[in-house]
Structure formats: C-alpha cells, structure tokens
Design a protein with these regions (language model features):
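Conserved short histidine dyad/triad with adjacent acidic residue
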Residues: 1-2, 21, 32-36
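Regulatory nucleotide-sensing modules
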Residues: 1-12
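Structural motif
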Residues: 14, 36, 61-63, 142, ...
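Cytochrome P450 core scaffold surrounding the K-helix E-X-X-R motif
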Residues: 17-24
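Cyclic-nucleotide recognition modules
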Residues: 28-91, 95
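Polybasic "coupling" helices that flank or enter modular domains
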Residues: 81-147
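Phosphate-/nucleic-acid-contacting segments
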Residues: 123-188
Length: 188
C-alpha cells in the first residue's frame, strides 16, 4: 500500500504499520491513529529496497486520502507552517524509534513487553474502576512483532507471569492493566 508515487494520509481510524522483511517475516513499526501521514514513514524507500511497508486497518473503519507525492512536495516547499509540521513529524518519529530501540535493548524481552504495554495506555487506554483497559485487541503475534520477540509463545509466557503477579488481566480478548506502576519503570 505504500507506493512511491503517492502519499497516504490516514484521516480517521487505527492502523498498524509494519515492514515485510526479505524472508517474509513482519516487523511491526507502529500503531497509528488518524489523522496521520503514513507515507512519510516510507519516504526514503526506493524501488531496489529489499523490504515493503504494510498498512493494516486495526479499527472497524478507517479512511484514507491519497495525494501525489510530487504535489505534496510542492505544497510543503511553498508553505512554511506545513514544512515545519513535516519536519516535526520526522523528528517525533525518529525519537519514538530511538525510544523503542532503547526499550528493546536495555530491558530484555520482558522489559520490552512491559514498556510496550505501558505505551499502549496512551494510545488506547480507557480507565475504569479496575484499572486501564487497552480498548483494542492486540494479539501475542503483534506484541512479538513490536518487541523483537521471536515467538508468540515467549510473549504468552511473559504475559502469564504478569497475570500471576496481578499486573494485567485479559477481559474479552483485551488487556486490562491492573497495575500500571509496575510497568512504568520499563517505559521511562
């Protein structure tokens, strides 16, 4: 979906952006909520690059807008505020990528998953009387793909440990975080 000739704008909805590696494995990059500029994540791709970007709709509905890359570039060059926005977008995405890399390398598998769960709070968290419900179904495969964990079985084992410690509970296939303070140090 991420062609070189078009810019993809997510107007509304939630998508998962992933990279399909040469060997067919999927590496999850981010969840994105609209409005968002999805194509800027793959702006540096060339035709000879050995991986592709996949954009998968995660919400019940999502709407997109396609704009010619050439037209977008021309408008950005002419509009200083838009240029500043695009530059800030790149900086924020770079900071998020560096943060995620830090979480994965400094915390090990468990810590990477703890940080990921904590970060889901700001994206999809809804407080209730028991804790914070991650109001989206996130599979063990998705968590593995975001955290650099090789199998969903490893994710299952780590989540089981969190359930036994009363940090999380699964409610209608969604994660209910009972103790966000337990996860927070891994996300700082």
């Amino acid at each position: 979906m991420c062609g070189l000739e078009k810019m993809i704008f997510l107007k509304e909805g939630i998508v998962k952006v992933s990279s399909i590696l040469e060997d067919g494995r999927e590496y999850n990059i981010t969840y994105a909520k609209g409005p968002n500029l999805l194509s800027l994540m793959c702006d540096t791709l060339r035709e000879d690059v050995a991986y592709r970007i996949r954009i998968r709709v995660e919400s019940e509905e999502a709407s997109f807008c396609l704009v010619s890359r050439e037209d977008f570039s021309r408008v950005v060059k002419q509009d200083e505020k838009l240029k500043e926005y695009v530059e800030a977008y790149y900086r924020e995405n770079l900071q998020r990528a560096l943060y995620r890399q830090k979480c994965m390398t400094m915390n090990g598998k468990s810590g990477a998953i703890y940080a990921f769960l904590y970060n889901l709070i700001s994206l999809f968290g809804k407080e209730n009387e028991e804790g914070i419900l991650i109001d989206m179904q996130v599979t063990n495969d998705d968590i593995a793909g975001f955290c650099g964990v090789s199998t969903r079985n490893s994710v299952n084992r780590i989540l089981r440990g969190l359930r036994e410690e009363n940090v999380i509970r699964i409610v209608d296939n969604k994660i209910l975080i009972l103790n966000a303070d337990y996860l927070k140090p891994y996300a700082d």
